[in-house]
Amino acid sequence: MSTQAGGRLVRREGYRVIPDKNIYIPPSISPEAKALLGALGQAKTYAMEFPAPDDVVGWEKMYEVAEGANKEKSEKALAASGATVTELEMGGVVVEDIRPHGWTDNGKVLVYVHGGGYCLFSARSTFADAAPMAAATGLRMVSVNYTPAPRARFDVIQRQIVAVFDALIDEGYRMSDLAILGDSAGGAMSASTVLNLRDQGKGMPAAAVLWSPNTDLTSPDDSTVTLDPADPILTYSTLLTTGAKAYAGDVALDDPRVSPLYADLSRGFSPVLIVVGTKEMLLSSSVRFYQALEAAGQTAKLDVYEGMWHVFPQYDLPESRVAVAKSAKFVTDHLNQ
């Protein structure tokens, strides 16, 4: 898409211009990452105009637009992976049951909670995000098609994810046979799921992997402000705020039910790997959650990548392949203990 006309930015329907974005391309990242970052930086000159947090009809229209935009990418990833994907209902919740190419049943399952600012995308349209971990782990993956906000608020969405775990337990799995992966908003919801399972006395998954999690909806913390101009994916004044409010509804944004950073982590948490890049606004969110977990005596690892951006493991980059391999090893090591 062209972002300029006669040397000036032009308005596009449904978008607003962000004149202060300055996407620096560091020499320290791979050539592949440099090329993609350049393309992302050009596209980020514009930001989509999102509906008000309580505008259900407006968000449904936006949801359909996002689904259509992601459809081809998801279908290509599915075809390239050779995985088998079946739509099922588990605990009253629709899921995509992913069996990677060459899958053999080892009695373990990785549950995936997709991102999308709490309001966008589905389990089907985010297959490209799930595919790398399916291939790297060789595990059966169950991607949860939760109801997006504001059609559902945080409590309904979290109950849906817990219901999928309950259904897996009913199938005969133990909690120690299960792990959870989430990215962005899905990373925050994955953390909340661990806490909900713990608080309901159901145990906790053997491992949790969180890619670029949004653990504190109150923001702005340091990187939310300082990295806003440099982030090629997120903009604080758009989805990062409106999506959070749509998800939380009438609940305060610092409520631990929506911001897991403020939860009582001393009572337990799954062994967790947090993956984040230095070029994303949620860097502070990841660092702070890691420090809170460590201070509470939990097993936590923070894996930070030079020059990488929001949920970078989903891309086909050298840095992404390293992050996915380490994420997969973390999951399989803990599932096999």
Regions found by a protein language model. Name each.
Residues 122-123, 129, 142-177, 315-322:
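Catalytic nucleophile-loop/oxyanion-hole region of alpha/beta-hydrolase
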Residues 316-337:
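Catalytic active-site module of serine/aspartate enzymes centered on a nucleophile-bearing elbow/loop
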Residues 94-108, 261-266:
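Short beta-strand-to-loop junctions in surface cap/lid or active-site-entrance loops
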Residues 195-254:
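Hydrolase active-site cap/lid region
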Residues 268, 274-276:
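Short beta-strand/loop motif that positions the catalytic acidic residue
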Residues 95, 111, 133, 154-217, ...:
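Short strand-loop-helix active-site module centered on a catalytic nucleophile
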Residues 1-103:
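A glycine/proline-hinged amphipathic helix-loop "lid/cap" segment
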Residues 106-116:
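Short beta-strand element of the alpha/beta-hydrolase
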